[in-house]
Amino acid sequence: MDDDDFDDIPDEDLMLAFTQATGNITSHHPSNSKQLASSAKPPAQAWPISDSARRIVTPTVSQGQATATGRAKTASKPTTSATTSRPSLAQSSQRKNLRQTTLWGGTLEEDAQPAPQAVSNRPFRADMPPEQPTHHEIDIEEMKTWVYPMNLGPIRDYQFSIVKNGLFNNTLVALPTGLGKTFIAATIMLNYIRWTKTAKAVFVAPTKPLASQQVQACLSIAGIPRSQATLLTGETPPVLREDEWATKRLFFMTPQTLMNDLSKGYADPKSIVLLVIDEAHRATGDYAYVKVVEFLRRFSKSFRILALTATPGSSLEGVQDVIDNLGISHVEIRTEESIDIRQYVHSRDINTITFDPSDEMMEVRDLFSKALKPLVTKLSSQNIYYGRDPMSLTTYGLMKARNDWMAGPGRHVNQGTKFSVIATFAILQSLAHSIKLLNFHGIKPFYNNLAEFRTTEEEKGGKGSKLKRQVLEDENFQKMMDMIEGWMKIDGFLGHPKLEYLCETLVNHFMDAGEGSNTRAIVFSEYRDSAEEIVRILNKQPLIKATVFVGQADSKRSEGMKQKQQIETIEKFKNGAHNVLVATSIGEEGLDIGQVDLIVCYDASASPIRMLQRMGRTGRKRAGNIVLLLMKGKEEDKFNEAKDNYATMQRMICEGSRFTFRHDLSSRIVPRDIRPEVEKKVVEIPLENSQNPELPEPKRSAARMRTKPAKKKFNMPDGVETGFIKASFFGQAGAKTAKPPARPPAPKETDFIAERPKLESILLSTSQENELRRNYTKIPLGHSKVEELDIDWYRHPTSRRVVQKTIHVKHGEYTKRCVKLFRSLAKSQAPANRYTKPYGETDTSSWELIPLPPLADETEGETSRKGQKKRPRLESGQEAEEAEQYAAPKKRQATAKTKSTGVSKQTNKPRARHTALISDCEEGGNEYDGNVDDDEQSRPRNFRSKGRGRGSGRGKKSQPKQGDPNVDYGDDCTRTSDMEMGTDGSDDGADLEDFIVSDGEVTSSLQHRPRGSTSPTTAPDAGSSSLSSKTGRKQQAPDSFASDEDDGDVFGPKFVPVTASAAKGSLPSTARREKPKPFYVPVELPATQDTTDGDDDLPDIEFLSAKRKREGTGTGMRTGSPGHVKVGDTSKGGSGGDQTREKPSGGAASHARARKRTVVMDSDDDQE
């Protein structure tokens, strides 16, 4: 029967196929010509038939008709009645008399004959809408077969049947523990991964230990490559989970993790084709299983569900909830008495042991009952709680009584009475748990619970509940606690008769097994306190190595076990490090712990599910023993009730008449024209599955170092309109936003494919090959290898500090910042190393040893910047360093000075001594100002200084503003004596006779003027004309400027000097022989009316000269008449030519009277 073609066909499909086959024979009988005529016409409506019935009906139809039927859409194309309709033996007379009429009684179609209809016991097939094809990308060739692995030995009939139905239906599999539910799941996952190209299969389990256990089983049975599988938990970072969903196809995880990944968009619900649910009896209420399936159905209906459990439920309603929530359409259930699994179930010897309370327990119960009697009497006297015995209190009974009273009489009592009753119920509910611990688990857990109750109340002081203090201060309660404390000090005190029997049972079991045996035992306890007490007692016994196995939650007296610790504990138990495992409810479900020969249930549970799960831990591979330790009375009754309930539920599920299955939610994934055939073979296990024993958990690597996951993805069902619409469209039928015009398709690379050129046009000619060989492929003579030249990044450093000229595009903000930065870095270097080349060559000119002339007076060397002090006298070692800082004035200062004078003079050729200084001045002249454009810098500016008002004393000096061009002006006078003019080299002061004092002279200089001097009201024109005639230069118009790009302009914009040949006079012979001065162009400016109105005091030249001599600042000397000033500089050695500068003191001096003197240092040696 295993290989029979029709062994998997339900009985109702067989009956339907027989009916259709008989109908076809009757319809073709020659005696019924009318039916023959009607059967030749196409039917008005096509009816789908089941797959099982189609396999039987097909032989009665021609091969062409069968092929057309298999590929046609149901209810979409009319076909022959033999293949798509359901004819019956006799047509219904009622159906023949029906005809469609109009509203006025006329017949719509007189000649139309109704299509033959068949009477079916399955009306849902006719009511179902047309099936939609799956959206998953399938592999047609692989789908023609489905693989049944033969790796585990002979085929088990029940496993083969369940796998066959689970591939095509949403199936609930209920098998006793240890009968291969994992093998069934692995086989179905293997086939769906084969059938689809990119779809994913997900295995969900309630806990991580269960999920981890299924990973190894599926990889070793089904042969799915380990590289395509992954284990995801809540501890996995979201970034790694997102990457795993994009690359893997088989997932093992908890339902909570799957729900989070679906809701956050890491997992695509449309990509899941198979969902395997372990411990499916949990799929009730708001559990994560229910939420996951609901979420998937919102976006996709083309996925298969396989639910695995040992006990579907404890009631009819619970089983129906599982069927509805998971969309189950088929149930495969087996019991231990089923024929096809009986040979695979090992015998289990169940021993039930009942106990009576010990004397110590009776004494404790009596004292505790007296302590609780006042509270119970208070409730019973008001007809709120009808129990009289305090030791029969239960948490559920008290909660139900309180809710009934609050819904009834409690609504009409005053608030004081209501609060008092609620407080009494709360205290009794907390103490009812202690009563349960005393009756079923022992005195020690009972004492620990009450000690915690007492400690919590004592910590509150006098602010706690009065009713709790009443219980704690009761004489019977205190006596009971003192008595228990005395018992616990006794060595070997057990506290419950179950503990004594448990120790004896386990010791006898290991003694009978013999030393070195591989036998193990599991003890199940409901509460953690009781489990820890059992471990403490068992470890004192010989041959017993016990350990506890609890959940992850922390209690008030102990910590939970992390998932890693749980897995390690199970591995140690399998390896033999521990031979007794004391577990709570976490060890009841699904754990394949290994060869367990003895199960001890320390307490009984009223739930048949938990009872069967506990018993299923043994008897998997060999016969096992089960010992039930029950207390007489209530606990024994609960066990019997659970046992009867389990047998009743198994019988009802097998019948199937009490449940409604959801065929509408079990969509077809395999196309109807494809009929997969079984292929029984040994599946090859990839080598990678056995090489790495670790779990396939994702690990963070260097290539996956993203710290943030991608943005949340919002999944939308098919056909949903997304985006925004106008507010005016609301309420309008079919209102949609206007679609933008379609863009032309982007050009493809193939559109620009050029024609293939001729071979001669792309190959090198003979001459080109010789040139290639001579110039590029051959090494030059005398070279052993090809030279590689490195770019010298230190060449031309000064070009980086200047903003070069542009034509069409201006320099950007970043370019100007970089230039300014390089200029600042250049200024920060030491002067001694500034001109040293980086490649080892140094300047041998010894320019540092050239002596510098003495500096100007401190009163004239005030700097213009805010906060800077006067320039001090420098030593010889510092002269070279400070020379450059004072040798290059600002560009705008030079511009303002040039504009104020209005005349430029021709300078001599610069000396070789100042070559380095000039390069720095060029850099300073183009210094970038962030607030001024290049164009604005090139324009001349007319700055006018404001003098101080007259007053009796020296007024407070105003602070200079940033960027003000007048900040370098002096206090009382304007000196232009630094203009370099041709002199005869003498030092008698005759070259300063043209320093004419005009009307702009202030009172500070008049007090030192001789009485016979020229009047200060001299006309400005005369002064300027005389100055021009004596200097022998023409006055230049103010608007005749030189170009900014002139190499000689080291201080910015300047006037075009007039050549010597055009001057009225001629320079002295000494000046003609000298080279032009290197860094300054003297200018002249005629006096104006504005410059004669100055009111600042100008100190006398003789007074300043005498002061300088007293201070010893230099050997310089100032002599001459009040109208002229002569400045002489002497060298250190006393030799060398003197420089004399002559400057008018008329209108030009008054206009720039607030300007400081610009210090220009020069060498005393004028000779080449």
Curated annotation (Swiss-Prot):
Main localization of the protein described in the UniProt heading: nucleus
Chain sites annotated for binding ATP: 175-182
GO MF entries: 3'-5' DNA helicase activity; ATP binding; ATP hydrolysis activity; four-way junction DNA binding; four-way junction helicase activity
Keyword line: ATP-binding, DNA damage, DNA repair, DNA-binding, Helicase, Hydrolase, Nucleotide-binding, Nucleus
PROSITE patterns in UniProt: HELICASE_ATP_BIND_1, HELICASE_CTER
Keyword GTP-binding found: no
Annotated segments matching region Disordered: 24-132, 690-717, 830-1168
Cited InterPro entries: FANCM/Mph1-like_ID, FANCM_DEXDc, Helicase/UvrB_N, Helicase_ATP-bd, Helicase_C-like, P-loop_NTPase
Listed Polar residues bias regions: 24-38, 59-68, 89-104, 895-907, 1001-1030
Ranges annotated as biased composition (Acidic residues): 920-936, 985-996
Alphabetical GO biological process terms: double-strand break repair via synthesis-dependent strand annealing; interstrand cross-link repair
Superkingdom of the source species: Eukaryota
Residues annotated as domain Helicase C-terminal: 506-665
Similarity remark: Belongs to the DEAD box helicase family. DEAH subfamily. FANCM sub-subfamily.
Protein name: ATP-dependent DNA helicase mph1
Annotated organism of origin: Neurospora crassa (strain ATCC 24698 / 74-OR23-1A / CBS 708.71 / DSM 1257 / FGSC 987)
Gene giving rise to this polypeptide: mph1
